[in-house]
Curated annotation (Swiss-Prot):
Biased composition (Basic and acidic residues): 81-93, 274-283
Residue ranges, compositional bias (Low complexity): 284-298
A Pfam family per the record: DUF5580
Name the record gives this protein: Uncharacterized protein C1orf87
Region span, Disordered: 37-101, 269-300, 392-443
Length: 546
């Protein structure tokens, strides 16, 4: 192409704008082509088109300041045709003058002929005939962080006060988030009753006490209780307290704690507590609970003993604490003295002691029992022995006489278990204290000693208490159903497949004669389902209360 554009000595040369597209960008430069007589009419038209804006803008450029950066000067150095232009200094000088005029014409397309700051312009070369500013591209910036939260908080009047008081332990995001939540709670503050309702329903939605729920569940719950927070704020809160591995899971305990601190009237105490929460998240989860109970530790111990007494009353004296201790010792393979909550619950369930999730949380929050989301089983066994001894001392005199042979038989159990294996001796040890009182109290009926679990017979003498006996036996049979369902949950997740749970409940309903109607079973399955699974604890509680 350059050989065809050589200018003869006697011919006039006219500058022409050439445009190249390199990498989705337009680059223009000026070249001088010979003026051919055949195309005079075409060239005059193009010359008038280019020279009109040149002459108009030349006057404007004389008054305005020169353009700071000439983009065409940078591009002409890489053009191979410019090497030949350097041989003709007159033509080269003309092209430079025309080039300056063209850049001035292009600059007039911006506001009042001034090019905006060059940091915001990525390509300012002009394609031919383009009157829109589509050739101006913004420089691609690095996406640092989401400043929407900061801008929303800056719109409030009290934002500088909140940030000014933020201690060094809290980050700017936490300070902004705290200020944003407080600003939205000004018109309608959160009440303690609403927070308690939220906490109860969150625990129902989380039957295994994992501490995490889906963002959709939290959003629906907040809409249900009309929490005075906007949906973008709720989304930001969920992102702030989300799990590292799975961002859809939210730590609802920390979120509720944050809302409670934001709703209170003492910001300095809240931020000091936030610092404690920061340090707690790096360490253990249960280290912040002992100071809460340290002031009233004897009262907490007494209330915990009362709760354990209530749990022991449901066993009807069948719990052998020594066997329970041996099972805990066998399960503790690391000899740490601590076991997780699912294992503690499963072992206690095998021995006839059924612990609810609320009771397990109480044990975990106790100063002497909880450690790093695990339970110190040795201290738990000691507290169980204290509760059982207090329960025996609280019984009336008539029942003490009947239950008197039971305590001396307990120390015989470990002596027998030392000589034989633990697994073979556990059912025999449970049957020995049951058969001896059955023989003494009911010798008239020869078939009574052959029954598997005649637990309620030695304690019920009058015929008036037949209804109470039937209720106790129904509860025992229902506990067999509970134990079977929990044993099917091998991973201790607290949920079971809905169809499998339906089949098991119907089968055990017929086997143990529980008299549960199929409509009630279907209603429990529909009400307490999570996707294709069923939540075990609330469904069983619902069936038990029928």
């Amino acid at each position: 192409m350059s050989s065809a554009w050589k200018t003869p000595r006697g011919s006039d040369a006219m500058p022409e704008i050439m445009v190249k597209i390199i990498g989705s960008k337009h680059f223009q430069y000026l070249v001088e082509k010979p003026k051919i007589k055949e195309n005079d009419s075409l060239k005059t038209e193009t010359q008038t088109m280019h020279q009109k804006p040149m002459t108009d803008n030349a006057r404007q450029m004389s008054r305005d300041t020169p353009v700071p950066i000439n983009f065409t000067d940078q591009q002409t150095t890489d053009n191979p045709d410019d090497v030949k232009e350097k041989k003709h200094p007159e033509n080269n000088q003309k092209s430079e003058n025309n080039q300056k005029l063209l850049t001035g014409a292009n600059s007039s397309r911006f506001l009042d002929g001034n090019i905006p700051s060059q940091a915001n312009v990525h390509c300012s070369s002009v394609p031919t005939g383009d009157q829109s500013l589509s050739y101006v591209h913004g420089i691609p910036r690095r996406k640092l962080r989401d400043w929407s939260l900061e801008q929303m908080v800056r719109g409030s009047s009290d934002q500088p006060e909140d940030i000014g008081q933020s201690p060094s332990g809290t980050t700017n995001e936490d300070a902004f988030l705290l200020a944003l939540v407080r600003r939205e709670l000004k018109s309608r503050p959160l009440s303690s009753n609403l927070l308690e309702k939220l906490q109860k329903e969150l625990k129902i939605l989380d039957p295994i006490s994992s501490g995490f729920l889906l963002q959709s569940q939290l959003s629906r719950l907040f809409l249900k209780h009309e929490v005075p927070l906007q949906l973008p704020t709720v989304k930001i809160l969920c992102q702030r307290f989300s799990k590292r591995g799975s961002p859809e899971m939210v730590n609802y305990e920390k979120l509720l704690w944050f809302l409670n601190s934001a709703a209170s009237d003492y910001p300095q105490q809240n931020k000091a507590a936030a610092d404690l929460r920061k340090t707690e998240s790096h360490g253990t989860h249960s280290q912040s609970t002992p100071p809460q109970h340290s002031s009233s530790q004897p009262e907490v111990n007494r209330s915990l003993l009362e709760i354990l007494k209530m749990a022991l009353r449901t066993t009807n004296g069948r719990l052998n604490i020594d066997n329970l201790n041996l099972s805990f010792r066998k399960e503790d393979r690391s000899f740490s003295g601590c076991l997780p909550l699912p294992k503690v619950r499963a072992i206690c369930g095998k021995h006839g002691l059924y612990l609810t999730l609320s009771l397990l949380e109480t044990l975990l929050n106790h100063q002497d029992l909880g450690y790093q989301n695990e339970i110190k089983w040795q201290n738990f066994v000691e507290m169980l022995t204290r509760a059982s001894s207090d329960l025996l001392s609280d019984l009336p005199t008539g029942k003490n006489e009947k239950k008197a042979p039971a305590p001396p038989m307990e120390p015989e159990v470990p002596e027998m278990s030392q000589s034989k294996t633990e697994h073979m001796k556990t059912p025999e040890e449970e049957l020995q204290p049951e058969s001896s009182p059955a023989e003494t109290s009911a010798c008239k009926d020869p078939l009574k000693p052959l029954k598997i679990r005649p637990v309620s017979q030695p304690f019920v003498n009058p015929a008036v208490k037949n209804k109470a006996e039937e209720c106790e036996t129904w509860i025992d049979r229902f506990r067999k159903l509970e134990n079977a369902l929990y044993l099917c949950d091998l991973s201790n997740t607290g949920v079971l497949e809905k169809e499998r749970a339906r089949r098991l409940i119907h089968n055990y309903n017929l086997i143990y004669n529980l008299s549960l109607s199929p409509q009630k079973i279907d209603q429990a399955l529909r009400r307490f389902r999570s996707g294709e699974n069923m939540l075990l604890e609330p469904a069983l509680r619902y069936l038990k209360e029928l």
